[in-house]
């Protein structure tokens, strides 16, 4: 009588056999159809190795189970997505920081003079941070497209149009809240020494310092937007705006001069918005001005020390540029000394 224990190859399984005889996880992988492995064996009479496919008791070659094939494809897709997002974050940083660094050389020649080694260090730390930012972003980008994990939507009519700008404000406020409190935590002595000192090693910071973080600090910054997109609906275009604004503000807050008009940092509006004039004072005094976009938490918690100015740094840059024979040499030195005395 023919044996009834032999099953057909995996490619010929019926849907019931794929699910398992018992219809549950325990019966999902039949024991006589193990994962196909290729084991090296010596070819008779030659001593050379050849590959031998594992077969079941009936001589049928064994194929990978559907679970293994799906898991392999999933891991490959997630890895590629994470690598792609790392590349995007890194290139975005290089383009934006590079553009503002070039603008600095035109607007304030000599401001970054003597900081070449520091800027190389800032770029190295920032590119390492780009990988840390890219991994969770890549995983969620894959999960959004493949499984709808996030609350990101691409149909602008899926929600009322007024919700689009509202979601931007909500995201910015929550991001600012997260940044303020994690930033204050970073200034606790032990944490500062272990991690945040990397960022404050830039004295003064340059346009390249926006993402110059220790990995511990980079992780605290990398998780906030992924957490928000899991919880709060946002249109893909609005999310792009938030990410773009985050990058621009991170760079301009560190580049050593004020790019925004005075009403944004010196008038009533400036009492609530953070630009380079506000954040520069944090890098000078450390124990104040912790916010990212808004001065709300600094003012509420008594850590707001107002805005600073760049007169002394700009005067020093003007003297350095004049001494190097730059185009401002014909009077830049005297102007620089006057500005320095005024500061």
Report residues per predicted region.
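A cross-taxon signal for low-complexity, glycine/charged-rich
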Residues: 1-3, 19-32, 36, 40, ...
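Cytosolic/stromal cytosol-facing helical appendages immediately following the last transmembrane segment
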Residues: 71-75, 79-84, 106-116, 197, ...
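Alpha-helical transmembrane segments in multi-pass membrane proteins
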Residues: 75-133
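Alpha-helical transmembrane segments
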Residues: 77-92, 163-174, 239-243
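Hydrophobic alpha-helical transmembrane segments of multi-pass integral membrane proteins
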Residues: 87, 91-94, 99, 127-143, ...
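Transmembrane alpha-helical segments that form the membrane-embedded catalytic/substrate-channel core
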Residues: 90-100, 170-188, 242-260
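Juxtamembrane helix-loop-helix connectors linking adjacent transmembrane helices
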Residues: 135-174
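Function-critical hydrophobic alpha-helical transmembrane segments in multi-pass membrane proteins
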Residues: 161-200, 206-214, 222
């Amino acid at each position: 009588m023919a044996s009834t224990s032999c099953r057909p190859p995996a490619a010929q399984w019926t849907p019931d056999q794929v699910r398992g005889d018992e219809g549950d996880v325990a019966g999902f992988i039949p024991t006589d159809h193990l994962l196909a492995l290729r084991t090296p064996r010596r070819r008779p009479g030659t001593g050379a190795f050849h590959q031998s496919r594992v077969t079941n008791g009936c001589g049928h070659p064994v194929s990978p189970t559907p679970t293994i094939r799906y898991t392999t494809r999933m891991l490959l897709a997630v890895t590629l997505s994470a690598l792609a997002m790392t590349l995007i974050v890194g290139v975005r940083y290089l383009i934006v920081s590079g553009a503002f660094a070039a603008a600095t050389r035109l607007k304030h020649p000599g401001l970054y003079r003597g900081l070449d080694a520091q800027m190389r260090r800032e770029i190295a730390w920032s590119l390492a941070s780009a990988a840390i930012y890219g991994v969770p972003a890549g995983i969620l980008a894959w999960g959004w497209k493949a499984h709808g994990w996030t609350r990101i939507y691409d149909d602008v009519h899926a929600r009322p149009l007024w919700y689009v700008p509202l979601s931007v404000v909500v995201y910015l406020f929550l991001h600012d809240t997260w940044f303020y409190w994690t930033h204050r935590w970073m200034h606790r002595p032990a944490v500062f020494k272990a991690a945040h000192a990397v960022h404050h090693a830039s004295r003064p910071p340059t346009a390249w310092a926006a993402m110059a973080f220790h990995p511990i600090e980079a992780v605290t910054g990398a998780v906030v937007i992924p957490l928000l997109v899991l919880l709060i609906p946002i249109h893909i275009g609005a999310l792009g705006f938030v990410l773009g604004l985050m990058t621009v503000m991170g760079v301009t807050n560190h580049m050593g001069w004020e790019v925004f008009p005075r009403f944004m940092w010196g008038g009533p509006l400036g009492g609530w918005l953070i630009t380079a004039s506000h954040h520069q004072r944090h890098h000078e005094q450390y124990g104040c001005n912790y916010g990212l976009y808004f001065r709300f938490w600094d003012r509420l918690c008594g850590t707001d020390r107002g805005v600073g100015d760049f007169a002394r740094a700009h005067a020093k840059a003007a003297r350095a540029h004049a001494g190097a024979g730059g185009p401002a040499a014909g009077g830049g030195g005297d102007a620089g000394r006057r500005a320095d005395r005024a500061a």
